[in-house]
Each structure stands twice: as C-alpha cells, then as structure tokens.
C-alpha cells in the first residue's frame, strides 16, 4: 500500500472551486485507495496499433496502479504505475522483452498533472506536463493484441490470475486521488463498472438497467456500492421512492396463499424484472436488508409451525466480498435445504431423505463475491419426467431449479419416493451457532456481507424472514450486532508470513467436544507449521514417557508439500495426511476441519478425509493460545512441544499467505490481530512475485540459493558462514582432547525429527564430534569419526518405554579418509524412522526398525561425551576443530559465544588455534616409555605430533609373533615407517620437502586399512603402499615410545636404522582412537621424560610472544608480558579468563576495601571481547561516593570509546574506524596519564589525546596576586598540589564489568580484562571475596589464577601502580593513614628542595577559587621532608621494556622504586606447593622483598635538559615504566606445561630495610645483603610482565628487550607465588610533627653515601684491569647443534646457597 493518510486536497479556495468545476464537468472520479477498489472501462481499441489516451490526475500517493490492459493472459500487456511518486510505463508485444519508461516529473505533490499516452505500433510514448519520453519493443509483431477491458485504479477481484498476462498487477496498491478527463482519442470511454469510487459516474448502479429508484426518483451514489434515491418530487417515499406517503399496513407475516405449484413458479424461474426481482419492487413494497459480519445471524423457530411441503420457493439477494459463507439453512437429519457461498460460487444442497441433491452455480467470468448485488431464486415443483429407460417413463419427479440474477440456471430432479420437505427445527439466515455441524453444509463459516428480502414460500404460507427479523417477531431470534441496513463489510484481508519466525497468536480455542476451522493458504515452500495449540500435561515430569502425562494438542503442518493433521485428546494421537497431492503449488488451497467428539473430517480443496481419534477420550482440552504460522521464539525451549509435530521441533514456521480464517464459523481478522500484536514479519497483503529471487545471486561465500515464497533461502551448510545471506563467519571451536562444549537444555527434549549440520577438521581418525545425551535413558544421536569414516549412531531406548523391541542402535557410515586436516561438512536428517547421513554432499540413507521413534535428550555435547551412565563403550575424545553446529535450526556454538543462551558449558577455545595436546619431553636419547601392546591386527590408525632438533631417533616400536613388527623412526631428518606382516620387512619413507628436525611441530599419520593399503602422511605430504600376502599385524609385547634399552637396538630388523632414542617432544598421541596419557599410562618410564615441551630458544625474537605480547629478556631465557593483550600463558597464546554475558545483562563488580582504595595518576586497561551489539558499556571504574571521578569503556554505534573524568570536564577518546560489533574478537588497550590518554583497538594505529593548555600555571599566576608575601611559598605549593588533583583519579572504589548498572548491558564474551595490576575476571573465577557477580554469566572453561606470575610482579604490578598515592596525616602522637599521594619519580626530578604539602584526595571539590578544603582528619598542613634521588645515571645502564618516547623529547626514563606494600593482599595469596618459604617471617630463607630505586634506561639521560615541573614531566612522558621489585631467591615449585626460563634482571641501587617495610620512612637508606642470581627457574603464573605498547602503525610487533651479561651483579628476582600483597603498589609517606630527627637522619645518610662513593671510586681506580670475577655457574648458553626441542643442558649446575644469617654482617656489598 502506498504510505500516507487518506488523500485530502488542500489547494487555495479559488483554485479549488475551479478544479472542482473542471472535475464535475469532465466526470471526475475520486479513488479512495481502499482494498477491492477498481474501475472498468470499455476496451481501448486504439491501443492495438495507434491511438491516444489522456487524463488528468491529482494525488499524493507514491505507488499505485493507474492503468492496465492486456491480451487475456498470453503475451501482450500495458501497465502504467506510480513508482516513487513518478510515472512508470511498461509494455510488451509478442512476448518480447518488456520496455520500460520512467519519467522524472514528480506527480505525488497534490497538484493537477496532464498525462498523455500515445501508441504507435511497436513504439509507445508517455508525456506528463512538459516531459515526454518514448520506448520501443523489439518484437516480431507490430500490433498489440487487446482482449481485456481498460482497468483504472485497480483490478476487479473476479479477474482470475490466469486471465492476466502480468499477474503481479493484481497486487499493486490501488490508486488514491482524483482522476478526470479520461479520454480515448477525443471521446470518453464507457464505464462498465466500478467499486470504491466517488463521482457522477462512479457506479453503474445508477445506470438505467440497474436503477433501483422507482416512480421517477433521482438516483445518487451514497457510498461505494450503495445508492440513494431523491424522492422529493415524486409523491413517494422510502429508500427507493417505492412507498406512498401513507402506505397501507403490511400483511401478516404468515399468510395463506391459494396459489399452488405451477401457477406460482414457472419452470425457468422469474427473470430480471419479474415477480421475484427485488430491484423492481411493486408499489407500496419496502425492502428489508441486514448486514452480517461473520458473528451475526438470525433464526426463525419452526417448532410450533413445522414445515410439511411439496412445493417450495426461496428468494433472496446478497452482496459480499467474502468467498465462503452460509446464507440459509433449514432442516436437520435427512430433511434439509442448505444455500451457501463457496469459493465465490453459489451452492445448493437439498436432501428429502432419499439422498442429497447438489447444485453449483458459477459465473462465466469472476466470482459472485464482487461486492455487487446478486439475486437468487430456488424452486421445487412436481413435474412428469419422460426419462430414458422403462423405469423412468411416465414417472412423477420433483424439479429443482436454482437461478442467479435470472440468467444462470441449473436444474435437477429428485426421486419421487420422498416428496415432502419436513422441518421442525430452525430457519438459519446468515449463519448458525455451529455451521460446520449443519447437515450437508459445504462450508463451516458464517456469511459476511448484506442479505436482502429473504423469503420462503410454499403451497400453504409465506415467511418474509428479513422483515420479521427487523420487526422483532417473538419467534425470530437475533444473534450478534445486526445492522438492518447494508454496510460495507471489508473483506478479510489476507496476510503473508514472510519468514519462518513470523506468527500470529489467536485467542484460546475452546473446542472441547466439537469445533471447526476453515482457512485458505497458498505457498511454494514444502514445510511449515500452520496451526498449533496444546493443553497442559496431566502431571509428572517432562522427561517421562508415560502416556498418562500426555498433553492434548491440535496442529496442522506442511511436510514435503503435503498437509498433515495432528490431534491428541490425551488418549493417543493421530497423524493424518490430509492431501493426496502436494499443495505447495502456489495456488490457493481451501482447508476445512470439523470435529464432533472422536469423529471428524478434514477437507482439502473439497476432497474430504474422515478420521477417528484413538482412545476413549472425546474432550480436546487446549490451554495455550492458537498459534498461526509458527511459534514464539521465547517459548520454543520452555514449552514441552509434542514430538509428533515435526515442524515445531525443527523450527520450520510457515511462509506464505493465509486468508479467510474462520474458527467455529466465526471470522478472525488476521490483519487486525497482527497489527495489534505488532507481529514481526506479517504483512497485510498477499502477492506472488514472478521474478526469481535467486536471480541476483544474494547468497555470499558459496551459499546455495533456493527459491521460497517471495524470498530466497540461503543454504549456508558447508560454507563456514551463517546468517540470512551467509554473511557472518561461523564460530570455530578448537579441541585438544580434553576440551568440550555442552549444551544443557532447560527441559528434557523429545523429538521425532532432527536436522543436524556441522563442519569439522581433524587429523585423528577417531573422535566424538556431537552427541545428544539423556540423564534418564540410553537415547542418543551421535556423530563421531571412526577409522577415518563418519559414523552416525541413533539409539532409541525402546526397552525403557515398553515399546516393541528393536534390533538396537542404528548405525550409518559415510565418507572415508576424513582425517586429512581439511574441512568437511556432515549433515544428519531424521524424519521418524527415516535416516539420512551426508558427508560433503554424498548421502547415505537408512531405515530404523521398530515402531518407537521418539528421541529423548537433556544435553547436546561436543568433543567429549560426559554423560556416560547408559553407554558401554565411550567414544574417543575429539582433537581438531568444529564449526557451524546447527541443531534443529539453533546455531548453538554461536549462541554460546554471543551469550544468547545461558545453558552452555565449555572449555574449548574459540578460534582456529594450533592444537598440541598433552606434550611430553624426552630429554635424552636414553629416555623412553613402555605402554601396553598396540592393537593393530586388522587395521591401524596412528597419529602423533613431534618437535625436535635431533636428526635421528626411534619414535615407536612394537614387536610381534614371528617376524611381525612395526617401527616409526627419524632418520637424517626424515620419517621412516618400517613394518612386517609376515611377508618380510617393508620400508616407507616420508616425502616431506625438507628435514623435519627444524624445531617445529610436525604431524604424522600412519594408517593401514583392511585392504592392506599403508599410508604415511607427514603434515600434508602423503605416501601410500599396497602390500600383498599377509594382511594381519600380530603384535605382542610392549609398545615402546621414544626409544629402547641399549641392548635392544642391536636386535632390531635390518631395515631399521635407529641406534639411539628420540630426543625432543611428542604430543597428541592417538593409538587407534585411544588417547593415552604417556606418563600416567606408562608401564615403565626410563630416563628423563617430563610433561610439557620447552624449546631451546632462550633469546627474544619477534616471534617469541604472540598477540602483541612484549618479550622481556631474562638471564637464561625470556618471558612475555601479556598484560595488555587479553591473553595469557608463557607466550601470550592462551586465552585469558573468559566470561560470557548473556541476554538480559550481567555484572561483575570488584570493590576495593574502604581503607585500600587507590588514587592514581596513571591507569592502564586492556580487555578482549566479541559481540554483535552496537551500544553497550564494557567496563566502568568509579571513585568513592561524592568524588565523581570515573572511567568508562563503552561501545557506541559499533565503535569503541572511552570517557573519563578526574576532577575537571569529561574527556573522551574513541576509535571511529574500527567496527567491533561484528562478532569477531577484538582487543582494546587504553592508557591514561593525567589528562593524557591513548586508545588502541586491535592493530589499528594508537589514538592519542592531549588536553590543550596548562591550567596549573594560569591558576598560580592569578592566585599569587591576592596572597600575602609571607604565605606565598606555602600557598604556591598547596595550589600546585591542589591542581595536581585534577590529574589524579581519586579514591577508586569499584570496577564494574558488563554495563548492567548503566542501563546499557553488554552481551557477548569478555576475556582477559586487566586494570592496573588487577585481573578482575580471574578474581571472579576464583570467587574472590571482593568480587560480586549477578545476572546471566557463564565462565568459559577454568579461569587462570589471578596471581600474577613471578616475572609479572617484578615489572608489571609495581609499574602500573607507580603513581598510586597514599595520603598520610600525622598529628602529635596519633597517626591516621588515608589514600593520598606520596613522592614519585617526578617529585625526585624537581630542583625545589622545599617541603611538599600533601593535599587530601578525599576532598570532593577541586575548587579553583581558593575556598577552604578541610580533610577528614584535620585541617592542618603537614610538611614532610623528602630526600631527593640523584639524576645521575647508574654505572650500568640496563635495557628496560620498550617505552615509546613522547612527541617532544627523544630521551626517556624508566623509574625504579617500590616497597613491600605494592604486593597483593594476603587474601589473594596462594601457598606454593613444596616451596621453601613456609616458615615464620624471620626465617633466613624467607626474605622480605627489597625496595629498589633509581633510573634505568635504554638511553643515557641528558642532564642538560631544563628542569621540569612535576606536572610538566608527566605531561611530557605519559608512558613510564616506573619501578621493579627485588626479592630473595627461592626454589620454585615445579609446574607442568609452563615456561620456566629465568627471572627478570634489573640491577640497581639496593636499599635494605632495618624494620618491616610498612614502617620504612620515605627516602631513608637501609642496608641488606646483596641478592645472588637465581640458578633455579622461578615458577610462572598465567600472567606476564607489563609493558606499554609502542605507538606505531599496524602491524605492531612485540617489543624486544635484552639484558647485559653481568652475572656477578645482583638480579631483580620475581616474587614467589607465596608472597602476595594488595593488588597495586602503594608508596607510603611517613610524616612527623617534628622534623629534627629527619634532618639528622638525612645528614647522616648523606655523609655515609659520600664515604661509600669515595671508597668505590678508590677501589675502581686501583683495580686489576686484567682480572674479572665471573660466576661460571651462570655463564653458559645452549648450542643448537647439540640440543633439541626440550633440553638445554643434560645437567644444570647446582645453585649457590643463600648466605646464612651469621654471615650477613660480614659479607655485605653495596652498589650505587
């Protein structure tokens, strides 16, 4: 329909008068644009060869049909449309390609426009106002064949689609507006008929042939299809001027009639204008009209005056747009008369006890439901019939005649045996309480339209039923809101269900004992749920099979093009195919369902099929709404759907058109219901597009397009994509044999039909891909790899439900050699007993035995089958990749990833990841394992991965009976496979393109099929060999992995070259589908065989750390800083702790303890996520109540942005170029330093934000003018610190993840969140008491530990919190500690040695007008004394993690300084397993961490730079790695599969506290024993050190740092796992009310420093230049030629012992 309201012209008054006069003079018509509107003019003969058509129009419609003509459905047509407010002409001749003309002049502007259409043979021209264009058709014929009338503004509904050349024209929106001066050449055409128009000639009802006005009344059109008569000058009254001014009283309703039989009724019936013509009433006659809208009817009670007649007449007139409806019925049982409208034709059914007589009357063109008046007359007379044959001669029969409009006549004869029509029931007019139950009724719904002058006469009396109803006769009962005038009754508009998700909910259907439903539908799609309703279960659990717990249900569904009826009244269901042929042919199909108790019938296109429900129940108890077209998405899981309704389980909603829905004879306005419910995907019209939807190739990425109903359907199976057009990449999950995904459904599911599809890629020949499992039965549908084939197992636990026994699980096999590490597609289709298994479009079919078809399941599992209670053989775990799992329309993998469902559990990894499962290291050639005998008698499938630098070595050996054996070995860098099946040894060599001892992982597949074909595959290179003779490999003894004992090598067969074992790593070992744990399952383990695999590389390279992790070079290895990557693990390749935020939102809140809230000048935030949302809040950090500081990371319009406020205005930074709402994984990195900020998304360039101006200097300059001189310095310092608060994030109170509290909840994955040393997601996974979770959350797998690794503590935790401020206020003898600020690196760089005033961060006001701010613990100013650190560089300049220089200055610094308070809190501590530090804190082996201060830089600091202000320094250097922590050495507890390559080296000045660290005064120098370098490798946690990402365009490479080789210098050793403090380092300033002791201490410390420096200089100048002390225990490096992938040295040197407490004062060393 064209948009807009009803057309209302609004021209100026004078112009309006002129135009109205013009329109009246030119017979102008007003088109209302309503449904069913049309105008029909005489044929335009000039269109054949040459002619003109012109008219004027005025409209505001943008799309509508103006003109149409054609040749009657063959080839030629001409169509003039309004499209986008402009005229478009299409025409063709002789089936040529249609020509199209589109004019540019807009005409939908409420102005008058002149249109001229000119035909000239093959050429047609169109002109509007001053614009004209022409087009020509390239056809064989010159003339256009014109057979139709000229249609204007719409197509009459009686014109069939088959009679239209261009069928789509019937569904174009009708024209809305004014049309005048229509001429064909110079003459106006004759208007043959119209509907829905206003104007002088809008309706032929006023034409002389049909003028209803009598006695000279003036006919006028009052409304579409309704006329009125002006009787003012006729002397008559009434609606049609047929009544005298003083009419006589009407006769009694029951009058005797002396006229009988043949005197009253002629054989042919009265024609138009005869006695029966209601449109030509006699003088004094009044018409009686009533309007019926589907729920109204009236009935006359005949119980007191029963009918016994032999001659009858029924007359009435009707007007309707409806195709079906009951007009009149009387009688019951064997005597009845029924007159109905069915499919637009008049049906008559008469039964006098001797069998029904049926008559059908149809018009030649169109239908009777054309909203025009039609007269019906039915007569029954006694006649003598001279029939053919002896039995019919001279017999009396009753002649039945039915005529419509006096022209169309049908006759027939009834038998003479029953001559009387007897009825003592009711005369129903317009409907009945239950039309479907009336005997002989061909329809089940009531009439909708107008009925006029319904009269019944027989030889005894006359019943004027319409008059009696209007006058309210006591024997006449009225039902519904009857209106006794003819009103327009809109046709029941059809609706179109445009997608399978669309549906309309109808009120609950109360049809306990009887009920009827009729409707029309049309579609081209083979499957879909038409109707569904069900009751509640009779008790018991959802998982029970007991028939006592069945729920009643009623459904109609399309399956494979056939219509099925499904009905269950609680005692057994029936499933009946109601159509003998397919009904998805695109034509209208009429369905009529009627039920009475257990009996009933369903009729499809007048072909009826009876049914009888099983069981004894006759009550259909439905509780739910009656759903039309489909089911609501939200209720599909929670609603226990009956398994017999296959389309419900398959989520196959109906797509197509539905019209004329009647329930129990009452109409349902589908369009109104859809609009009231806001039904998505339900359109208020029905049209069938002729263009092929797939012609434009809409499916992307290789999707297969299929035609649907006015839509295309993209089959994305096998493409790796999902979505309507296969536009969205499907989620990939990686499995390593210990990983799974499990969908735990809220309720037990019972299905009889399943559609399953997925893609897989694996190198193993065995492994479970998908299985449905039940907690209560052995039911399963399982897909697994079995010997390189796809195996489908379907087991329906028939014994449990007591059904007829079956032969057990059904199995199907398809495909071969599917373990080729390529993507394959598998699909399973089950429909009851029928099975189909397809692999890469190759289909295998099977048929299940037994009558039981119901599959029960609670879970859908992938990777590992965890529900094992009812299976005897557990399938092997899967190693490989799965993608695109769709089970009955649900893409569970993607729903799980996106958080659309909350009932999934998984630890498999998202993304296509390299898989190395359960690696072990053979550290020497003499190491090996022995397992149980390899079972490889008839066939064999072996798979493993290896990595080594050794060119030779025995990988696998198993001997056997006789000469049988198998060997896999590495010879000169190539794999050899040697075997003997009894025919002598054979050798197969791998054909890899280069030696495989390159320290990279390689895949090896060795297989032998039952046909004795041997296959050796190295990575992607395959060698095959067929051996004749013996086919069985009879092995015995132990299977040796990695080597043999020395004395066995000499006894190996001659083709075996190995004389030594394998040195390197093995992983993912698969022995014929069995995944052994090489260490746990070993019968013997000889030598050094350990879990995990560490490569020989000990130096940083660009590939050392993945995902932009930063490589940190250590003394004997390297570590990776993963904090800003969202990943973890030794090389930043393991996913961080991941939570899935589901629908409805969720929230994770970390709350700092009130006394432990940090205030920061710098913040660092990194997080990974994936989502499809375009607006959400990811992370928000808030300050304490009243302060108003915050930081928020959010998604807006699909892009990432950050907004923060640290005391001034809101500051924003975003990345508008990176769209993150695409469902892919993205990593966001944000840093803040004061008001400066950087933001980076993935590998996009870093966005930087620097605020303009320096507010501090301007404020100080203004303030000094009003401050007394004597207070100037103190207030200057106070103001400076006050201004500094505008760059400090004060008193951080909580971190909130998920945005639920902000009203913008996030849905999707969040992974590896890192903020200022905190890993909140990991804390949440460990149930930290400071973390609270709420909403729909699910943890993916097992989250890594929140405790940072040893290396991380040294450089990450303290570096991130270097600017954390602790505010301390001291008054007299009382000390109160609050979150405040301490001197930092910047303080030590200023040249001002005056006392520093520390202002409270808790003061909520950043007042710039010098208002007094009173801290909570007092208002006095505390002036601490701070000792300055020297700016001179240390003697040894070490390299720190790369920090990008700021734009202005090239040199940069790395500040080093920390205290013990920077460590995580004791609540977060995790005791080390077997660690040495379990004793008391004063134990000599459990040293406290030592603070290290100073500068370390990769560049020499230029001391000539001008001194910088405190604020200016941080503005210039926004990214600074501030400090590191030195700890006492300790032996770590071993952890498998973790890199243990050493510790961070960071030499610097050492300060040893003489008291516990919390009491260490700022600047005080203490002494401690120097730390020895660690010889043992410290344990690594899941985290890694932090480093800021360098600012450079993508792609970003990991930063590489290195450490100088000074083994004798003290090394910064990482924190052990047992030593943890609060998350975030804190500097503590101790202040005193008296400064005397501080001054004395400073002087003494300075003197001591000078003495030490002089002594060191003296020793330096007098040292022996040719002698160096070197710690040989640390001075070694691996020789790659002598090492392999696992071993650096055969034996590590012993660690030097830590100096004992007795030697501390003796062996002290000091470094400055």
Swiss-Prot record:
Disulfide bonds join 206-219, 213-229, 231-241, 450-486, 657-686, 694-705, 699-714, 716-726, 1065-1093, 1100-1111, 1105-1120, 1122-1132. GO terms for molecular function: calcium channel regulator activity; cell adhesion molecule binding; metal ion binding; neuroligin family protein binding; transmembrane signaling receptor activity. GO terms for biological process: adult behavior; chemical synaptic transmission; gephyrin clustering involved in postsynaptic density assembly; neuroligin clustering involved in postsynaptic membrane assembly; neuron cell-cell adhesion; neurotransmitter secretion; postsynaptic density protein 95 clustering; postsynaptic membrane assembly. PROSITE patterns: EGF_3, LAM_G_DOMAIN. Residues 29-206, 289-486, 493-686, 732-904, 918-1093, 1137-1345 form the Laminin G-like domain. Ca(2+) 2 binds at residues 779, 796, 854. One of its GO terms (cellular component) is glutamatergic synapse. CDD domains: EGF_CA, LamG. Ca(2+) 1 binds at residues 335, 352, 420. It is a single-pass type I membrane protein. O-glycosylated; contains heparan sulfate. Heparan sulfate attachment is required for synapse development by mediating interactions with neuroligins. Pfam families: Laminin_G_2 (PF02210). Predominantly expressed in brain. Residues 1373-1392, 1458-1489, 1525-1626, 1679-1712 are annotated as: Disordered. Belongs to the neurexin family. Neuronal cell surface protein that may be involved in cell recognition and cell adhesion. May mediate intracellular signaling. This is Neurexin-2. The lineage of its organism: Eukaryota, Metazoa, Chordata, Craniata, Vertebrata.
